[in-house]
Regions:
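N-terminal helical capping/dimerization or prosegment-like subdomains
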Residues: 1-95, 325
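Active-site metal-coordination/substrate-binding segment of hydrolases
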Residues: 78-151, 445
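A common structural junction motif
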Residues: 87-88, 240, 244, 349-358
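Acidic, glycine-rich active-site loops and adjacent beta-strand->loop/helix elements
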Residues: 87-89, 153-161, 184-189, 212-214, ...
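Acidic/histidine-rich catalytic neighborhood of metal-dependent amide-processing enzymes
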Residues: 117, 122-199, 461-462
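A generic structural motif
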Residues: 124, 214-216, 332-340, 369
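An extended, acidic, His-containing surface patch that forms the Zn2+-binding/catalytic region
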Residues: 190, 248-325, 337-346, 354, ...
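Polar, glycine-rich mid-to-C-terminal structural blocks
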Residues: 213-277
């Protein structure tokens, strides 16, 4: 019987090639033009779970893209781990900023990944990290090392807000019964510094539309006499932060819980170089809410950011018009206790109230979700900590993530289960950005570490 380390070493080329093949499929859930590719990816995941040793695998249809469910129940008296991941990916735009085509994976060395990293859309978020669990399952079943029951729930709509997952989970509570939920869709502090994500921010995502005249107008004939929707929109957006970068929406901070000085001091122990941070982003200064560090701003504090803005003429050359409409997409990252639906309504009310005369404003809510905190005294956290210690040789550092996985709070509500976030990516892996990548070392280390979580969770649960 092989150890997991030797099994991974013996099969690393195959593991890598399988992931590369998966990354070649453009499973972009946000674009209907890629529907066939998303469905193809679901089929590939189904086959992979079957080969990995699941006794039962099915493609569960939804009103959108399907959920791939798989399980191996060895003894109903043993604990059950539910693995969640997603096979859909973000759109790759802007394509001109990629150094290589986003769905033609290439391996290149980087400063943080001297062993090489796979560059492709979905490499880290989440195909690479999701597939670690499939290969870990393969090892455990092939070597009779699976110590408990396991269920897989891999969806194809995470990047569009998991719009059909809530209904599926609510309708399949008994089927999805588990003792802990395991997700790898987060990151580590550094390649040699393992960490467990203990908190996620919530999310409220909206689109705003400002309408002025009933058609585009000649800027010479009408400029200065009619409200310009683009000018109005940019001014309204600028007013959403004050001079200290606090968000000005009334009631926005009412339910924000401030961390104690002791908790902030614990956060500050995580290794962080501000100079390296700025260098990696090619910026000469950081920005954010006054009174907080960079790590605090992007994890324990709520934010409001414009994700896209457009209107008027943006083609080549000049066209002197006053646009009839202007648009923006805005996301608000929220901290635990902030309800995303309440925040959405607060934003909508405020944004509509600050519109000047001469324009009409429409706010359209999109998706959202609640924040989440994992208790560090839970069995799942302790098992994850022991697993990282086993393979990295050091105890992982708990950290709050600035990102959002809205379904985590849904799982706790519907399934009454805690979620453990065992991520192996790095913040510098450029998820959602051009040149997304995932270190080969990280990928293989994830496969090596996950079986230890199964072992320790089963032991601690008894």
């Amino acid at each position: 019987m092989k150890t997991v380390q030797s099994y991974v070493n013996d099969n690393k080329d195959r593991f890598l090639n399988e992931l590369i093949d998966l990354l070649k499929i453009p499973s972009i859930s946000a674009d209907s033009a890629y529907k066939a590719d998303v469905l193809k990816t679901a089929d590939v995941i189904k086959t992979s779970l079957e080969k990995a040793g699941c006794d039962h695998v099915e493609i569960c249809e939804t009103e959108g893209f399907p959920i791939v469910y798989g399980e191996k129940i060895i003894d109903k008296n043993l604990p059950t781990i539910l693995v969640y991941g997603h096979y859909d990916v973000q759109p790759p735009d802007p394509l001109d900023l990629w150094n290589s085509p986003p769905f033609e994976p290439v391996i290149q060395k980087t400063e943080l990944h001297p062993e090489g990293a796979i560059f492709a859309r979905g490499a880290c978020d989440d195909k690479g990290q999701m597939y670690m669990h499939v290969k870990a399952m393969e090892y455990m079943t092939a070597n009779n090392e699976l110590p408990c029951n396991v269920k897989f729930m891999i969806e194809g709509e995470e990047e569009v807000g998991s719009i059909n997952l809530a209904k599926y989970v609510a309708s399949n509570r008994e089927k999805l019964t588990n003792d802990v939920i395991l997700i790898s869709d987060t990151g580590m502090i550094a390649p040699d510094v393992p960490s467990i994500t203990t908190g996620l921010r919530g999310l409220s995502y909206v689109e705003v539309e400002v309408t002025g005249p009933n058609r585009d107008l000649h800027s010479g004939l009408y400029g200065g006499a009619v409200a310009n929707p683009i000018n109005v929109l940019t001014k309204m957006i600028a007013s959403l932060h004050d001079e200290n970068n606090h968000i000005t929406v009334p009631g926005f901070y009412d339910k924000v819980e401030n961390l104690s000085d002791a908790e902030r001091a614990e956060m500050a122990k995580a290794p962080f170089s501000l100079d390296a941070y700025k260098k990696a982003l090619d910026i000469d200064a950081v920005y954010g809410e006054e009174g907080y560090t960079t790590n605090e701003r992007n994890s324990i504090r709520p934010t409001l950011d414009v994700n896209g803005i457009w209107g008027g003429y943006t083609g080549e050359g000049a066209k002197t018009v006053i646009a009839s409409k202007a648009y923006a997409k805005i996301s608000m990252r929220l901290v635990p206790n902030q309800d995303w639906e309440d925040i959405t309504e607060l934003f909508k009310t405020h944004f509509e109230s600050i519109a000047p005369k001469g324009v009409k404003v429409k706010v359209t809510p999109h998706h959202g979700g609640q924040g989440y905190v994992t208790p560090i005294d839970s069995i799942g956290y302790k098992a994850a900590s022991k697993a990282y210690k086993q393979t990295f040789g050091k105890t992982p550092i708990p950290q709050r993530s600035g990102g959002s996985i809205p379904i985590v709070s849904l799982f706790e509500k519907e399934l009454k289960s805690k979620t453990i976030l065992m991520g192996f990516g790095l913040d510098s892996d450029a998820i959602h950005s051009p040149n997304e990548h995932f270190g080969i070392w990280n990928y293989l280390k994830g496969i090596e570490t996950i079986p230890w979580f199964y072992k320790y969770f089963t032991e601690l649960k008894k």
